[in-house]
């Protein structure tokens, strides 16, 4: 079953017809709930997790989201699938952890646990949207709040 989920994730990612690059590295720092630093062959790469938007650190649930991601990734080996760099020079990427029994798609785990929203601005991803709906129904993470404020609205209000 896990193998099928992995293939579905990879298909959803690769179906965007954009050339991707992949590499292995170690997460040396978690900046917030959707940004990390990955060391690859001595280079430090700033990564923004693709398709998700986590609460800002100054926002409700921002620190919790960061801590969740730290527990998942800090000092661990990861597989990075990067598509392109954003306007801030960060690599937009899908992050995976592999262990003996499974591959874990971290972007999806952040959504499923209620630690991030699906970032629908550029593209919809039905797999992640379904995970978000499940997290909402189960009041997980940010969804435990009556009316959670979406990070992109929070940032807009802070300007």
Language model: regions and residue ranges:
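Small beta-barrel nucleic-acid-binding modules, primarily SNase/OB-fold domains
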Residues: 2-159
């Amino acid at each position: 079953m896990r193998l099928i989920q992995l293939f579905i994730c990879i298909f959803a990612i690769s179906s965007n017809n954009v050339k991707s690059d992949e590499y292995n590295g170690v997460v040396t720092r978690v900046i917030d709930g959707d940004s990390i630093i990955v060391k690859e062959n001595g280079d430090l790469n700033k990564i923004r997790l693709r398709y998700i938007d986590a609460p800002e650190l100054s926002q409700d649930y921002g620190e919790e989201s960061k801590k969740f991601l730290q527990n998942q990734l800090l000092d661990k080996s990861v597989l990075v699938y990067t598509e392109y760099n954003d306007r801030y020079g960060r690599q937009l990427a899908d992050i995976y952890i592999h262990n003996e029994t499974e591959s874990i798609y971290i972007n999806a785990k952040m959504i499923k646990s209620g630690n991030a929203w699906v970032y629908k601005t550029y593209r919809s991803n039905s797999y992640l949207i379904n995970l978000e709906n499940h997290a909402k129904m189960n009041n997980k993470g940010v969804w435990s709040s009556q009316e959670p404020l979406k990070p992109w609205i929070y940032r807009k209000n802070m300007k």
